[in-house]
């Protein structure tokens, strides 16, 4: 994996075999989040993400607050294709998502069908190594392969996790489950960063799920 510091969101174009140009967003250290707009502006969220990403802006300081999830990401993934490159030991997590559209945590097919998965060798020019799965699934792999312990990131568990491992919280909203943290580990992994797209389903405090984009940077 590439150990260079990756600190910006970049947008590029890649020409497919058929000759058509497909946009690709490269998620680096930063997570795409959107400004804390009023609910009436929800329909504009996708356009906001595209505009900011196209400018190459750093968005990790902006907060993803309480918005209707589908309005944002369905519009977002309709226009943009996410290119995901992941290590071989994580790639098997993506196969069932691509085939069936849902994981145990409920990641919707409307998101995953827009993604394409590559090995590192297939995507060297992308300069990224990302996997997308639930935090529980990714946590199991990391615990097994890298001796890093993580667990569900809702409610008080977040604070327990951070206190136990001395993790630094980058952004957390107890209502929506937004969290970004880093763990300075050993062995092959220098930094493990989990950043999730959190949202609230009205009518139940814990009736929600979070897809996770995790970055693994080698020492």
Walk through the language-model features, giving the residues of each:
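ATP-binding glycine-rich loop module of kinase domains
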Residues: 10-86
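Active-site beta-strand termini and strand-to-loop segments that position acidic
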Residues: 25-29, 102, 114, 182
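Conserved kinase catalytic-core segment
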Residues: 138-188
